[in-house]
């Protein structure tokens, strides 16, 4: 299929149908040549990153919106506008290929309209680009409800967060300590002419100067290295697992944190729990590549009686389901798929899982509550409420008035993440 047509289909699936980019994009990639996968990804990610700007330009250039069965052609126009405004593709190729996309989408009669819209944008680009950032939606390219949360929670930092969310994320690696230490792997990258830098705190983390195909990484197939953001790798620092312990990684998919524990310590057993059977397959695949063993269980964290093996855990990593507002730079569709009411519903779910997991923790054991969110309701307020109702919970490493650690997007080039460490008093 024509790459621009495939991109329009992805935008339609995400924006109009509410499907996630991580579902829609791989499906679309199956319809195009492998060599075009990166181009498709760049167009889809970029168009979703700057969606309100593209929408406002399209609105200016069209007499009436395309509706119903023609909506996919509206998204094809956005694909064309993104290429012309944000990519280095020659204008004639961007326009020509986008117009041809209408043919691939079985809308040959709309080719003239699409061509005219894109040509008019070329003629009036400067004025239209200025117009597209003249309102808050276009200037910050965040939904108003999320912008308000950020402004209220981070009065000094919200613009930094917005900017980080709108930039491309770097590629972080986690070196498998069972094979090499970080300095050794750094040398392997150097030998392969792959530029990289270290992280000051995440002891196995390496940041690549430019993203690359994983198969070009030394020893990827042999399990020497994995792709994982440095902020997620800090879960090991906070959990501090020890040899011989019984450890639970709750809401474990896709398994990066489970693997990190297994790479670093000889636990008696690590249990990887998740309620999503499809995503658990990723856990199994990742562990297989890394030649690691864990007990993988499909179950609801709120109902341990369905899966619990009868012995309390020494340590629990609760990577709670969340709004994922800390990883927008990796998943720009989150901005348009989430709603304000989702935060309240997620906070309730987190609270239920928190209580259920606490009951599975041994006296003297450690629970790390983690999210990849940056909303206070899911993080600081969640932990405060838990401490208020749980007398045996002792907060470690932070103050009760401001519990845990909030990492904001872009901080040492990390994703947004939250961690709070709690010990169960014996």
From Swiss-Prot:
Record gene name: rsmB
Organism lineage: Bacteria, Pseudomonadati, Pseudomonadota, Gammaproteobacteria, Vibrionales
Catalyzed reactions: cytidine(967) in 16S rRNA + S-adenosyl-L-methionine = 5-methylcytidine(967) in 16S rRNA + S-adenosyl-L-homocysteine + H(+)
Keyword Iron among UniProt keywords: no
Predominant place of localization: cytoplasm
Keyword Nuclease tagged: no
GO molecular function: RNA binding; rRNA (cytosine-C5-)-methyltransferase activity
Stored Gene3D superfamilies: Helix hairpin bin (1.10.287.730), NusB-like (1.10.940.10), Sun protein, domain 3 (3.30.70.1170), Vaccinia Virus protein VP39 (3.40.50.150)
Binding site for S-adenosyl-L-methionine: 251-257, 274, 300, 319
Enzyme class at the top of the EC tree: transferase
PROSITE patterns: NOL1_NOP2_SUN, SAM_MT_RSMB_NOP
Protein name: Ribosomal RNA small subunit methyltransferase B
Function description: Specifically methylates the cytosine at position 967 (m5C967) of 16S rRNA.
């Amino acid at each position: 299929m024509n790459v621009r047509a495939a991109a329009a289909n992805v935008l339609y699936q995400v924006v109009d149908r509410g499907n996630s980019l991580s579902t829609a994009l791989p499906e679309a990639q199956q319809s195009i040549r492998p060599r075009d996968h990166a181009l498709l990804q760049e167009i889809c990610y970029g168009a979703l990153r700057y969606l309100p700007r593209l929408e406002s330009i399209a609105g200016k250039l069209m007499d009436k919106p395309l509706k119903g069965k023609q909506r996919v052609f509206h998204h094809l126009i956005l694909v064309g506008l993104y290429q012309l405004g944000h990519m280095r593709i020659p204008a004639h190729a961007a326009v020509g290929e986008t117009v041809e996309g209408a043919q691939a989408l079985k809308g040959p009669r709309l080719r003239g309209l699409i061509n005219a819209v894109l040509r008019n944008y070329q003629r009036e680009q400067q004025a239209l680009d200025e117009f597209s950032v003249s309102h808050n939606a276009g200037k910050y390219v965040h939904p108003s409800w999320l912008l308000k949360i950020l402004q209220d929670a981070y009065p000094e930092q919200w613009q930094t967060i917005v900017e980080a969310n709108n930039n491309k994320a770097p590629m972080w690696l986690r070196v498998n300590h069972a094979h090499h230490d970080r300095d050794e792997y750094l040398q392997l990258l150097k030998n392969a002419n792959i530029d990289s830098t270290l992280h000051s705190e995440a002891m196995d983390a390496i940041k690549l100067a430019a993203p690359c195909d994983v198969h070009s990484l030394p020893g990827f197939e042999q399990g020497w290295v994995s792709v994982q953001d440095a902020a997620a790798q800090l879960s090991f620092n906070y959990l501090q697992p020890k040899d011989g312990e019984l450890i639970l990684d709750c809401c474990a998919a896709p398994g990066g944190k489970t693997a990190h524990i297994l790479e670093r310590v000889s636990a008696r057993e690590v249990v990887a729990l998740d309620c999503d059977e499809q995503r658990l397959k990723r856990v199994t695949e990742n562990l297989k590549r890394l030649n690691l063993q864990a007990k993988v269980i499909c179950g609801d964290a709120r109902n341990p009686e369905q899966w619990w093996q009868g012995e309390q855990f020494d340590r629990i990593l609760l990577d709670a389901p969340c709004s994922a507002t800390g990883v927008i730079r990796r998943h720009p569709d989150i901005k348009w798929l989430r709603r304000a009411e989702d935060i309240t519903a997620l906070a309730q779910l987190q609270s239920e899982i928190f209580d259920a997991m606490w009951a599975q923790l041994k006296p003297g054991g450690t629970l790390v509550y983690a999210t990849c969110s940056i909303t206070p309701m899911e993080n600081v307020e969640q932990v405060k409420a838990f401490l208020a109702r749980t007398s045996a919970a002792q907060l470690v490493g932070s103050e009760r008035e401001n519990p845990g650690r909030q990492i904001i997007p872009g901080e040492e080039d990390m994703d947004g993440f939250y961690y709070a460490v709690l010990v169960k008093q014996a």
